[in-house]
Amino acid sequence: PGLLCYETLLAQETSDFDWPDLDERTPCSMCYTSGTTGNPKGVLYHHRSTILHTYAQAMPDVFGVSASDCILPIVPMFHVNAWGSIYVGPMTGTKIVLPGAKMGDGETLQHLIETEAITVSMGVPTVWLNLLAYLNESGKSVPTLKRLYVGGAACPSSVITEMKDKYDVYVHVAWGMTEMSPLGTVNMFKPGMEHLEGEELLEAKLKAGRGVYGVEMKITDDENNELPWDGVAFGSLKVKGPWVLSDYYKAEPGTTLEDDGWFETGDVATIDKMGFMAITDRTKDVIKSGGEWISSIDLENTATDHPKVAESAVIGVYHPQWTERPLLLVQLKEGEESSKEEILAWYEGKVAKWSIPDDVVFVDTLPHTATGKIQKFELRQEYKDYKLPEVDV
């Protein structure tokens, strides 16, 4: 009761539609950034940018789908329009299957892939780790699946190797942003790379890939000097393109892009001589957990608001399922005593539950630079092998 059949609703409508006469730069959709360095910002897409982005996605060395394919986007539509998949499907005649509420569940994904004959899918690394775990435990397979696209966080090497070796599925790393509609790069090998083997092959596959047609990239140093594409030099990643935003929604015009039209992505990257880009760090120390971004600044500010806390730092620590999870380091005020439970309880109702740190370490002092900034690099080195407790996220 209360449910409507989609096919019945379609049958009740006529096949004619009077298309409105719209200017190509008329807005057609808007998504918001995750707000890791402040409030979420609106990014408005217009018909022209969306069509051009979709053309690029449909190219053979990008998504390369056709009417004979069936795609399964494991990303919500509010997250940059499900990575653009909801547009590339209708453009190419590709069948689209939406996963529903259990989009991260390995058993559900395997069932959908098998029963709907999915050939191409896309999602964050956590999704594929869950699928792999279920396949390995159940002994089931994904017979029709040909390609996976991974983005939103660093792809574990095990996803690439196990999917190919056990299930003959090719995994392609991709990179993009809300500000880019979202696609920026896809890792598709160029001719002449067939000779790569072993660790060299895996290292190449783990890179974010080359810029898709229409996207320009460069890396610069602190003085905005362009750096070489040698795979060694790393700098601030900047992009241009027909589907890169010009300004955030309701922002002061001309305040989003640099004077020469480049967009500062906030990522630090290298680009090799073949044009393959690799993200090496986050300029704002953002923690990427299961494809979602967690602001270390927000967590630090909340912790420091606690009456017993003098100073705090949050770093990302490796997690086998979520890629990274936040670890909170706390320096208490002199003479104060506290506990992990007390500090974590302080976060309840102040930040999203899934962003609360997994663990708390109490320290006598935190390392600082000469200018008074906490040395996050030193902390990451010190706690790089830290084992987080098992918690529900």
What do these predicted regions represent?
Residues 1-24, 135, 201:
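ANL superfamily adenylate-forming
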Residues 13-26, 30-72, 84, 94:
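Conserved adenylate-forming
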Residues 27, 33-36, 44, 71, ...:
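Conserved S/T- and glycine-rich ATP-binding loop of Class I adenylate-forming
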Residues 51-70, 80-119, 134:
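Conserved AMP-binding/adenylation subdomain of ANL enzymes
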Residues 74-79, 153:
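Conserved AMP-binding
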Residues 91, 118-123, 132-203, 216, ...:
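Gly/Ser/Thr-rich phosphate-binding loop
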Residues 114, 121, 241, 246-247, ...:
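AMP-binding/adenylate-forming catalytic core of the ANL superfamily
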Residues 211-238, 273-274, 336-340, 375:
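Conserved beta-loop-beta connector loops within the AMP-binding
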